[in-house]
Curated annotation (Swiss-Prot):
GO terms for biological process: thiamine biosynthetic process; thiamine diphosphate biosynthetic process. GO terms for cellular component: cytosol. The keyword S-adenosyl-L-methionine applies. It comes from Cupriavidus necator (strain ATCC 17699 / DSM 428 / KCTC 22496 / NCIMB 10442 / H16 / Stanier 337) (Ralstonia eutropha). Its EC number is 4.1.99.17. This is Phosphomethylpyrimidine synthase. GO terms for molecular function: 4 iron, 4 sulfur cluster binding; carbon-carbon lyase activity; zinc ion binding. Catalyzes the synthesis of the hydroxymethylpyrimidine phosphate (HMP-P) moiety of thiamine from aminoimidazole ribotide (AIR) in a radical S-adenosyl-L-methionine (SAM)-dependent reaction. Homodimer. Binds 1 [4Fe-4S] cluster per subunit. The cluster is coordinated with 3 cysteines and an exchangeable S-adenosyl-L-methionine. Substrate binds at residues 237, 266, 295, 331, 351-353, 392-395, 431, 458. Zn(2+) binds at residues 435, 499. Keywords: 4Fe-4S, Iron, Iron-sulfur, Lyase, Metal-binding, S-adenosyl-L-methionine, Thiamine biosynthesis, Zinc.
């Protein structure tokens, strides 16, 4: 498949979105909550009719979870320079526990805002940021623990259920909603769509088993949940580097990622104009945005880890919190005493954040300042409702290093920090590996659930083998499906370029689709209510040779259509009862249909006679020769 060129400007990107973003045979619909401004998006995939001897039978539309935001709504005009609608602004203002600041609190933020050299790069439609009023806590966990159901929680309940309970009484959906029993492996999943209530969401947030990453300054956000008892989510990474790229390219990567199904995005920029790049992404993102603040703090030192200070890092946290970043990866578990444990590893410390903090600890022979200042970090987090993504700085970089003392020592420290964050009512998820062979994955999940008190687990794969450079989206997708079933709440995607180079748009697409497959497989295995609906619809379309429906119900309709058309490009092939794999004479599904038609055409007497012979055969012991 040809690779698409990146957008040259915001104007060309907007034009491209208007022309190419729409999904085939789909409509954008909304579920309305208890108030008119709770409008939860979902995508409905339209199906063609089934042709029978008795005429055409309608096939119902299939609702699917949608991460694409307003970009897939034909009624919304996209203006990247103005940003997306502020869907949460009224909810936040009505709570009365925040205040609009007179200006930016971060020294670095003020410097960037007043620097004439970056004026042409800045997002022009900025408003002053909000912060909690003195003594207030504005986290979703704090509200949940006070018994308050926020609009964000109600939004999540509708989004997770897709209102599937309304379909169970409709005859058209009866067969499509059949589902194999799952094995939730001890998780407390809702049994039916109607069990996914706002109160259920509140309880999960209050317990710490789930988070709603939703900074009060990211008003464009469409709320979503990350937790063991919800749908498995996936994260996509983007970010510029010293050798790439433009602001428009990074916004394009974000939009491209959510088009294919990324539930959250991490901006891992390490190149020029990190601050401005992040602002453009946030103002145009309907999904939560995460960052690794130590990257930008290191950039401020000129790349010298030893020169990092708590004061510099604190200013970076505030700068990013006031922009609207929803979760921070913070490597507070990389303790001085753990660093020597990595000495005998094959690949040492492979986390960028982990290596930065390890180098700082060794250079100063002091404890990690992220650990010693953790309570102060919590004060910042709860003032803006930024969630922790506690980083696994000592994750294994190869399967030989998996499950060692350094990895699990850090994990136990992350559990200690989770308990500390929860005392502040700050939301937490835990980052996990990495590279782990299949037989050692369950131990990772068990350790996390035990020592981190069921806080959501967020893993990078894991890759289950190290022998396939160029195919690590597959080696990691195998591990991701397994650990997702075992209880991981969010899977960080891996692209084919992992370990080899910076991914382009097509690599991002490949990684996201791979991880959508893994997450969906995990939902099926867990028994998420309604998870099998799309599988059943596609299987029925496949058996009935409804080729267009097969394409459109898939995760990547364009890829499926292009593969089919490579050998059978004619339009007539879209209604043919065969494909190029078996041809017209050897198609098993076509033969099965012919057998069914033949059986249905037999007189009742003939059918009865065959049934009698069948019974006689069984009574004789099912022996062909006596």
């Amino acid at each position: 498949m040809a690779r698409t060129a990146p957008a040259a400007s915001f104007e060309s990107l907007e034009s491209d979105l208007d022309q190419k973003f729409a999904y085939p045979a789909s409509s954008k619909t909304y579920l309305t909550g208890s108030r008119p401004d709770i409008r939860v998006p979902l995508r409905t995939i339209l199906q063609t009719s089934t042709r029978t001897d008795k005429g055409e039978m309608q096939n119902p539309p299939i609702p699917v979870y949608d991460t694409s935001g307003p970009y897939s709504d034909p009624d919304v005009h996209i203006d990247l320079k103005a940003g997306l609608p502020a869907v949460r602004a009224k909810w936040i203002e009505e709570r009365g526990d925040t205040e609009v600041l007179p200006g930016l609190s971060s020294e670095y933020g003020r410097d960037r805002a007043n620097d004439p050299a970056t004026a042409h790069l800045r997002f022009a439609q900025l408003t002053n940021p909000r912060r909690a009023k003195a003594g207030a806590n504005v986290s979703q966990m704090h509200y949940a623990r006070k018994g308050i159901i926020t609009p964000e929680m109600e939004y999540v309940a509708l989004r997770e259920s897709l209102n599937l309970q309304a379909l169970y009484d409709k005859p058209d959906y009866k067969a499509l909603l059949r589902q194999h029993p799952g094995n939730a492996l001890g998780a407390g999943l809702p049994l039916r769509p109607e069990d996914i209530t706002p109160e259920f969401v509140r309880q999960e947030i209050a317990s710490g088993r789930a988070i709603i990453p939703a900074n009060i300054n990211h008003t464009e956000l469409e709320p979503m949940a990350i937790g063991r008892n919800f749908r498995v989510k996936i994260n996509g990474n983007l970010g510029n580097s010293a050798v790439t790229s433009s602001l428009a390219e990074e916004v394009e990567k974000m939009v491209w990622s959510i088009r294919w199904g990324a539930d959250t995005i991490m901006d891992l920029s390490t190149g020029k104009h990190i601050h401005e790049t992040r602002e453009w992404i946030l103002r145009n993102s309907p999904v939560p945005i995460g960052t690794v603040p130590i990257y930008q703090a290191l950039d401020k030192t000129g790349g010298i880890a030893e020169d990092l200070t708590w004061e510099m890092f604190r200013d970076t946290l505030i700068e990013q919190a006031e922009q609207g970043v929803d979760y921070f990866t913070i490597h507070a578990g990389v303790l001085l005493r753990y660093v020597p444990l990595t000495a005998d590893r094959v690949t040492g410390i492979v986390s960028r954040g982990g290596s930065i903090m390890a180098k700082w600890c060794l250079a100063h022979h002091k404890e990690n300042f992220l650990y010693t200042h953790f309570d102060e970090i919590c004060e910042i987090m709860k003032a803006y409702d930024v969630s922790f993504s506690l980083g696994d700085g000592l994750r294994p970089g190869c399967i030989a290093d998996s499950n060692d003392d350094a990895q699990f020592g850090e994990l136990r420290t992350l559990g200690e920090l989770t308990a500390k964050a929860w005392k502040h009512d700050v939301q937490v998820m835990i980052e996990g590996p990495g590279h782990v062979p299949l037989q050692r994955i369950q131990a990772n999940m068990d350790e996390e659930l035990k020592h981190c008190y069921e806080a959501p687990f967020y893993t990078l794969g894991p890759l289950v083998t190290d022998i396939a450079p160029g195919y690590d989206h597959i080696t990691s997708g195998i591990g991701a499906a397994n650990i997702g079933w075992m209880g991981t709440a969010m899977l960080c995607y891996v692209t084919p370029k992992e370990h080899l180079g910076l991914p382009d748009k097509e690599d991002v697409r490949e990684g996201i689709i791979t991880y959508k497959i893994a997450a969906h497989a995990a939902d099926l295995a867990k028994g998420w209510p309604g998870a099998q609906l799309r599988d059943n619809a596609l299987s029925k379309a496949r058996f009935e040779f409804r080729w267009e429906d097969q394409f459109n119900l898939g995760l990547d309709p364009e890829r499926a259509r292009s593969y089919h058309d490579a050998t059978l490009p004619a339009e007539g092939a879209k209604i043919a009862h065969f494909c190029s794999m078996c041809g017209p004479k050897f198609c098993s599904m076509k033969i099965t249909q012919e057998v069914r038609d033949y059986a249905a055409s037999l007189p009742k007497e003939a059918q009865q006679g065959m049934e009698e012979k069948s019974i006689e055969f069984l009574k004789k012991g099912s022996k062909i020769y006596s």
